[in-house]
């Protein structure tokens, strides 16, 4: 079973909303030696990212060989026109997409803890909409281990929910100091019920702080989202960094994540999966991966974190 633990659900999309994300992807692509056309990518994003029913997601999952996807919303209190009511409507739509495609989608609500309504939004999402946890983007300007966040995490802990939290530097306007994995350190102490997935593992340049936590905290995990850009540009370096991350954090701590449909503007899901599948055969001669490690990354670890092991024990 293959599980994508990091997919961005978007109920709708317009050119203004897509522009920043496409700009980020173009920046990544140029670092990889690609020469993408911004206008073409923007057009594709506007035409294909909006997916209120989740039908496009399911089609892409089937095309890429993905059995289950963790679909997330993203909230940003800085966007004044994005009121809490509008954000909560997006979370409700995500919950409805899950019901439309039973067994295929696991959903995480977009919550910005700076909202006065954030804790109650979280409660409704978990207890009424059927979502399984929340997604944080602290690079929007908040401390994921701060007092505002803790009010939300209290609700999350009560419901034994999952926290997927962005950790990795971004281009401006991202406030990178808030995306440091070490800001998540106290959550394991104060909320041991919460399983934390550090999106990007802090990034393929700065993953060691994440690994230092994951090695000692049983509830700390990370995903591989955007690590595929390193694999594309320098597969040997990708293999070396991932090997060290596994050795230091442990083989059960890393989950496959795509960051689709944003990242799949560059190449299809199958390519991302293949980067991982090829590790035992295509890694440099002095770097070794086992088939068991590949199976854990592509699905086994996520099954455990998401509580799917029993439900899919016969899959």
Region spans (language model):
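Mid-to-C-terminal alpha-helical segments outside catalytic/metal-binding sites
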Residues: 1-3, 14-63, 68, 123-124, ...
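Divalent metal-coordination and catalytic microenvironments
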Residues: 6, 61, 69, 94, ...
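Active-site environment of divalent metal-dependent phosphoester hydrolases
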Residues: 10-13, 76-79, 113-117, 169-173, ...
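Short aromatic-enriched loop/helix-cap "lid" or pocket-rim segments at secondary-structure transitions
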Residues: 13-19, 82-83, 120-122, 176-177, ...
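Generic structural signal for well-ordered alpha-helices
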Residues: 55-58, 91-98, 122-123, 149, ...
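Active-site gating/metal-coordination segments in enzymes
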Residues: 67-179, 228-229
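Short helix-capping segments at alpha-helix termini
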Residues: 99-104, 190-194, 216-219, 249, ...
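Catalytic pocket-lining loop regions of alpha/beta-barrel enzymes
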Residues: 128-133, 141-256
